[in-house]
Amino acid sequence: MNSFPIPVVLLGPGSQAEDETLDYIHMPQGMSVYTPPVLPEPEQIACLTQAQSVLRAILDALDRADPKQPNPRIELWALDEENRQLLKQVLGEGEVSARIEGEYQVYIQEAVFAGVWRVVSTCPDATTDYIEVGAAPEVLRGAARYGANQWSLDVGRVPDGVMNAPSILAEIDDQLLSWHPGKPVHVVNLTLLPMSPQDITFLDETLGAASVTILSRGYGNCRISSTAVPYCWRVVYFNSQDTTILNTVEITDLPEVACAAPEDLRDSHERLTEVLKWVGSI
């Protein structure tokens, strides 16, 4: 009798040739966390009383911050260079920064203490420099609202290759008609929709661009841009390879990702208290 050969077949993951390799989008690998500022020895900064006074004023503003009231503001115009440098060292740079373009320019940087914002505006005849404490600087909300100049969406002629953008624009226009401050945000998630490059281009051209650009570096990177339509924002998230992972339109007064939450302000109060104890100001 002849032996009948039984072929050996390898089984299990990796034993068989794959028809195609899945190319997964990499999600952000890191998350921005609070890092205490590196401070000089207390005796080295004992004479810098102006900066210490500003830090105590910020702590007081954090203690009484109320979203229903105007944000407390601390002016910095009287500080000399040494005191400014100490203040800059203590505040550091947090997750969110913003820029407002127009007749005058405004630069905004959140401190490592969330909800503490440094606001510098420049115009031909004056410069302002102050700290503002709150969810977001009021000038940011105002510029986005008053910088808009397109109160209705006119789709007009639809170019070739554009399929789904007109229906998205109709949804946005409908939401804008009924939206008012205090109403919950309405999000259009373009990532989940069959949007071609031509659709995205047509959408952005129709919404237009306005004066506010915000960058948030919390979990990955997020770019927020105001449009020419009031209360309408483009919000795009990127991973560490600069690949888009979420692309949205938001109808709101200011996207939540750009704002400090109430618990952030409470955490900042605790952290700044520890810093001031080290400095010897409290």
UniProtKB/Swiss-Prot annotation:
- Identify the InterPro entries for this entry: HupH_C_sf, HupH_Hydgase_express_prot_C
Looking up Gene3D superfamilies in the UniProt record yields:
HupH hydrogenase expression protein, C-terminal domain
Superkingdom is Bacteria
Keywords, A to Z, come to: Plasmid
One of this protein's Pfam families, by short name?
Answer: HupH_C
Q: Which family does it belong to?
A: Belongs to the HupH/HyaF family.
Q: What is this protein called?
A: Hydrogenase expression/formation protein HoxQ
Can you name the source organism? Cupriavidus necator (strain ATCC 17699 / DSM 428 / KCTC 22496 / NCIMB 10442 / H16 / Stanier 337)
